[in-house]
Design a protein with these regions (language model features):
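Short low-complexity stretches enriched in small and charged residues
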Residues: 19-23, 50-55, 91-93, 133-134, ...
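N-terminal type II signal-anchor transmembrane helix
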Residues: 11-50
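Bacterial extracytoplasmic/cell-wall-associated proteins, especially those involved in peptidoglycan
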Residues: 60, 144-148, 159-354
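Intrinsic structural disorder/low-complexity segments
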Residues: 5-8, 24, 340
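Signal peptide-directed extracytoplasmic domains
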Residues: 44-202
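N-terminal amphipathic/basic-hydrophobic helices that include classical n-h-c signal peptides
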Residues: 1-13
C-alpha cells in the first residue's frame, strides 16, 4: 500500500464518525425544536385572569418582552424572544391593546402581536357625564389618546365644522351606549363614529316629533339633559319635559336648578340659594331666556324620548316633593307653586340641609 493511501477499514471508520456527528447534530436540532415548541406552549398569562397588554407606538421588541415578563410564566419571554428573532418582529411592532386570557400560549399571543390583531375595546359612554372635560377624561382613560388630545379636538373649531357642532353642542353627538373601537383609534375617527350613530338615531319619525315640539334635534338633547338632571324617575320624565316645553312656549325663563349647578360647576349643591342664582352664565336659565347653548350632561335615550313624547298638561311650575322621593309636585299657578315650595323648604330645614 502506498504512503498516504486510505485503507477500506479507515474509510469505513471515517464514514462511521460522520454518521455519528450527523446523528448528534440531528438530535440537537430535534432537541432545540422540541424545546422551542415547548416554550411556545408556555402560558403568556400566569395571573389567573384576563389581562390587557398595551403596545405603544414607540415600543420595541425589548419593551414588549418586558411587558410580557410581568404577566407571563417563567421562560415565556425566552420563547417569545425566539419567535421574534426568527420572524424579525422588530419590523412588525403593531401598537394596540391585546387581551390575554389565562392559559394563552406564547406562540398564540406572538401571532396576534405580529399580525396586529387587537382586542376591540368596549367603550361605554354613560349618561349623566356633565362636562366635555369629564367626557375627555372618560375617553382618555379607555383609549390610547389621552384626555389632552381629546380636549384639543373638542376645542378645534375647524375640525368641529365637519360635524356642524361647536364645543357647546358637541355633547349632543355622544349618545350614551356601548361602542366597539380599537384602543389605537384616532379621536377624529371616534367623533365620526359618534356623528354617524347620532344621524342614525334621528329617524324621520323623531325629526317630525322634534318639529312638532318646536325644537331642533340639538335643542331636544339640551332639554333632555335638563330632564335627566331633574329626575331619575322614568315615569316622571315626560311630565318634566312637558312642563319646560310649556314655559318655552309661554316665553317664560326655564329657571332650572340643574343649569345653575352647571354654571357654577358645583354639582354637589343640594340646595340652590339666591346667591347661587346670581352667577353670570349663558347656562344659568334664571338669567337667560330659552335653552342654554348646549347640554348640561349627556342625557339617556329615555330622557330624549321623554322630550319627543312629552306629557300634555297645564303645569308651568314644579318643586321637589317634601318626602325626598326624587319626584316632584307640579303646579299650574304661582300660588300653588309657592305652597309646594314652602313644604319642601320646611323639609330641608328639618333635615338641616343647607
Amino acid at each position: 500500500m502506498q504512503k498516504g493511501q486510505t485503507t477500506p477499514f479507515a474509510v469505513r471508520k471515517m464514514n462511521s464518525n460522520k454518521k455519528k456527528q450527523l446523528f448528534i447534530l440531528a438530535a440537537l436540532c430535534l432537541a432545540l425544536l422540541a424545546g422551542g415548541v415547548s416554550l411556545g406552549f408556555i402560558s403568556a398569562n400566569r395571573t389567573g385572569q384576563t389581562v390587557s397588554l398595551f403596545v405603544d407606538a414607540d415600543d420595541t421588541p425589548d419593551s414588549v418582552l418586558y411587558k410580557v415578563d410581568e404577566i407571563g410564566e417563567p421562560f415565556s419571554v425566552l420563547g417569545l424572544r425566539g419567535f421574534m428573532t426568527v420572524s424579525r418582529y422588530g419590523a412588525h411592532v403593531h401598537p394596540g391593546r391585546y387581551d390575554i386570557d389565562p392559559g394563552t400560549s406564547i406562540y398564540r399571543i406572538f401571532r396576534r402581536l405580529r399580525a396586529g390583531q387587537q382586542t376591540p375595546v368596549r367603550l361605554v359612554i354613560p349618561a349623566s357625564l356633565r362636562t366635555v372635560e369629564a367626557l375627555a377624561a372618560k375617553l382618555g382613560a379607555n383609549l390610547q389618546a389621552d384626555s389632552a388630545a381629546w380636549m384639543a379636538l373638542f376645542r378645534d373649531t375647524v375640525a368641529l365644522k365637519e360635524f356642524k357642532v361647536d364645543t357647546s353642542t358637541l355633547p349632543c353627538l355622544f349618545i350614551p351606549d356601548t361602542y366597539e373601537v380599537f384602543w389605537t383609534v384616532e379621536p377624529i375617527v371616534v367623533l365620526r363614529k359618534m356623528n354617524k350613530n347620532y344621524r342614525r338615531f334621528w329617524t324621520d319619525a323623531r325629526l317630525v316629533k322634534a318639529r312638532e315640539a318646536g325644537l331642533s334635534p340639538y335643542e331636544v338633547v339640551t332639554l333632555a339633559s335638563i330632564v335627566e338632571q331633574e329626575t331619575a324617575n322614568e315615569a316622571e320624565k315626560p311630565m318634566v319635559a312637558g312642563m319646560y316645553i310649556n314655559r318655552l312656549r309661554q316665553g317664560m325663563k326655564l329657571q332650572a336648578d340643574p343649569t345653575v349647578k352647571f354654571a357654577l360647576r358645583r354639582f354637589d349643591l343640594r340646595r340652590i340659594l339666591h346667591e347661587h342664582l346670581a352667577v353670570e352664565s349663558p347656562y344659568n336659565t334664571y338669567h337667560v331666556e330659552g335653552l342654554p347653548p348646549g347640554p348640561i350632561c349627556l342625557p339617556s335615550k329615555s330622557s330624549v324620548e321623554s322630550v319627543l313624547n312629552y306629557a300634555r298638561h297645564p303645569y308651568i311650575y314644579m318643586c321637589a316633593k317634601e318626602d325626598f322621593s326624587g319626584t316632584h309636585n307640579f303646579a299650574a299657578t304661582y300660588a300653588d307653586h309657592l305652597a309646594n315650595a314652602r313644604r319642601y323648604s320646611a323639609a330641608l330645614d328639618s333635615r338641616g340641609i343647607k
